[in-house]
Amino acid sequence: MMQESVTETISNSSMNQNGMSTLSSQLDAGSRDGRSSGDTSSEVSTVELLHLQQQQALQAARQLLLQQQTSGLKSPKSSDKQRPLQVPVSVAMMTPQVITPQQMQQILQQQVLSPQQLQALLQQQQAVMLQQQQLQEFYKKQQEQLHLQLLQQQQQQQQQQQQQQQQQQQQQQQQQQQQQQQQQQQQQQQHPGKQAKEQQQQQQQQQLAAQQLVFQQQLLQMQQLQQQQHLLSLQRQGLISIPPGQAALPVQSLPQAGLSPAEIQQLWKEVTGVHSMEDNGIKHGGLDLTTNNSSSTTSSTTSKASPPITHHSIVNGQSSVLNARRDSSSHEETGASHTLYGHGVCKWPGCESICEDFGQFLKHLNNEHALDDRSTAQCRVQMQVVQQLEIQLSKERERLQAMMTHLHMRPSEPKPSPKPLNLVSSVTMSKNMLETSPQSLPQTPTTPTAPVTPITQGPSVITPASVPNVGAIRRRHSDKYNIPMSSEIAPNYEFYKNADVRPPFTYATLIRQAIMESSDRQLTLNEIYSWFTRTFAYFRRNAATWKNAVRHNLSLHKCFVRVENVKGAVWTVDEVEYQKRRSQKITGSPTLVKNIPTSLGYGAALNASLQAALAESSLPLLSNPGLINNASSGLLQAVHEDLNGSLDHIDSNGNSSPGCSPQPHIHSIHVKEEPVIAEDEDCPMSLVTTANHSPELEDDREIEEEPLSEDLE
């Protein structure tokens, strides 16, 4: 039992490996061998001790096995005596290194090892454990270092590979560039004539442009020759008289004769814009009615390529317009005969390049506007613009036809006149008017007017039978145009607010309207100014002039009353005085037509055309009183109704804007037949417009015309 307990204790205990060599060599002396093992532990290293322990354990195990085989027949006593010495030592060398407290107590009770030996074993065991920990840490550090080295090597290899790839890519790109350059060189060598072909194409384009220019110049020369021939033919017929200082008349009054409507539309589209019916009227009747229907729509386009105008006389009060057109057209036709060149600027759409002379313009035209895609596209755009303008012109012509139909006036057909007549239109001004009213309005390019064709033969006077029931006619037109101003402004509020168009009313009417629109029917001067600028875009400029006109009207008109109140000085309207002043203008005695303003509105232009129709239709018959019949009398009556209506609603200050409705302030002016003493020897008998006004009406006219002149200055 003692041997078995010692064997189990040793097998479960841990002994120091440094002292195992002495125990295995001396099995019989346990205590002495333990001491000697403590002495040798300091001399032998840990690694050597481990090897020795393993070898000794193996040897002890072998010896134990051999002894068990040889002593199997011996008595149990002898085997019991030997086992305590051999088995525990061999088993102890193979046991783990940790000794539990229970195992320690068993060893102490059995007295196999002394306490000193056990302490020495424990110390050795701790030293061995520390050494093992140090070895493990050392191994870990070495492994980490090796791992880091491996990672660094891998990174270096990757970087090297990337650098190699980049170098390869650069080399490939260089090779591709070299190949492309080589291909380009080869292509240039294979096709040396491409540049020459391009140069030839450019030269061909320049030649085509030069040919087109020559063709256009030839067309212009042909046009000039045809115009001169037409002028000579008219002069021979006695229809016109050209003084020595005058070379030509405006193209608007002398359309081309001998050309078909298609040729006129193609060659003179920007010059005349006149209907073929009107051309026939010129050739047969000897009267100029061309601009009656076209002035309102084509007045802004006729100044582009008109022939030279060298005379300085006033025609229809349009001296300023004719001077401006003469300057622009003479520059185009004389020094530089090209439609696309004027005032030193290229008129190609969107170009406007400055050219000092005509030669530089030709170079610019051949270089910049050659036959290419851009120029072709610009030509197409210009064609579309022309088409749109033609469509608009046709619409306006249809509108004019409908208006004339509504006014019970069919278009007049031209009739041949054996004796040309001298008709001075109601739109023209007499010499006395030019002398007495230096502040007459200059004619603007967009203002439609009726032209005059001077004719030197044949007296003609309107007979009394042609103008019946003048009083009834006057009353009807007075009622027709006696409409409030608010009904005119209300539907056209946005138009007057945004368009730079002067309203067709006098300053007095506008001031009254401003005051009547206010809540308490009274306004200060600044509030009146604000109403003018807020309601009409026309009064947002030239404030100094029209404000002076407003103050002038406020101070001179009796219908405006100045009242002092809490707000200060305010202005009110005396409706009784205003209506009294209005009735004085409406109910005037029938007088001769005189002093008709030169600037007419759209309705006045229409009535001017009706007057021309009157002259063409009725006056040839009036030259022979026996040919007058009831039809001609009715026609004259209708014409005079429209004439008196147009004269009644003209603005008393002589100003009216195109496209505006009739005006509430009117002068009662009527046509009266009366032979007038001729002022020129060449005109023995003619229709000259004169007028008589009462002193009160003259005062009102002076009041309204003076601020208007200030406005235009």
Swiss-Prot record:
Q: Write out the ranges of the annotated region (CTBP1-binding).
A: 420-424
What does the record give under GO molecular function? DNA binding; DNA-binding transcription repressor activity, RNA polymerase II-specific; protein homodimerization activity; RNA polymerase II cis-regulatory region sequence-specific DNA binding; zinc ion binding
Q: Where are the transmembrane segments?
A: none
- Sequence ranges of Low complexity compositional bias: 290-303, 436-457
Q: Please verify whether the record's keywords include Cell cycle.
A: no
Q: State the domain notes.
A: The leucine-zipper is required for dimerization and transcriptional repression.
* Subunit-structure text: Forms homodimers and heterodimers with FOXP1 and FOXP4. Dimerization is required for DNA-binding. Interacts with CTBP1. Interacts with FOXP1. Interacts with TBR1. Interacts with ZMYM2.
Q: What is this protein called?
A: Forkhead box protein P2
Gene designation: FOXP2
